[in-house]
Amino acid sequence: MSTAIAQQKIRIRLKAFDRRMLDLSCDKIIETADHTAATAIGPIPLPTKRKIYCVLRSPHVDKDSREHFETRTHRRLIDIFNPSSKTIDALMKLDLPSGVDIEVKL
């Protein structure tokens, strides 16, 4: 019979259109976790979502003339194991760019 030690885990999912801003945010989060003696795993790259929009170029007749636009949503996953109260406080005070969407699960 094995005894499992209950580990506390924080899972952080990040989404952004700009990959560089996303990577900088991941680096800040991991650096903050390392300074507070928590174990950070990641950033784990998740699949990039591509959304393509097809738009008619002319306002009237020419349906053959179309233009395509796309948005790419880059995603990353970070797991923080054994966070202390200092870790959570430091993550709450962290200043991240406005173009990065963050989901936190305990």
Curated annotation (Swiss-Prot):
SMART domains linked: Ribosomal_S10 (SM01403)
Name of a matching Pfam family: Ribosomal_S10
Domain of life: Bacteria
GO biological process: translation
InterPro entries xref list: Ribosomal_uS10, Ribosomal_uS10_dom, Ribosomal_uS10_dom_sf
GO cellular component, one term: ribonucleoprotein complex
Keyword Ribonucleoprotein included in the entry's annotation: yes
Annotated coiled-coil segments of the chain: none
Gene3D superfamilies tied to this protein: Ribosomal protein S10 domain
An MF annotation (GO) of this entry: structural constituent of ribosome
Entry keyword set: Ribonucleoprotein, Ribosomal protein
Record function comment: Involved in the binding of tRNA to the ribosomes.
Family per record: Belongs to the universal ribosomal protein uS10 family.
Classification via HAMAP family: Ribosomal_uS10 (MF_00508)
Subunit description: Part of the 30S ribosomal subunit.
Protein name: Small ribosomal subunit protein uS10
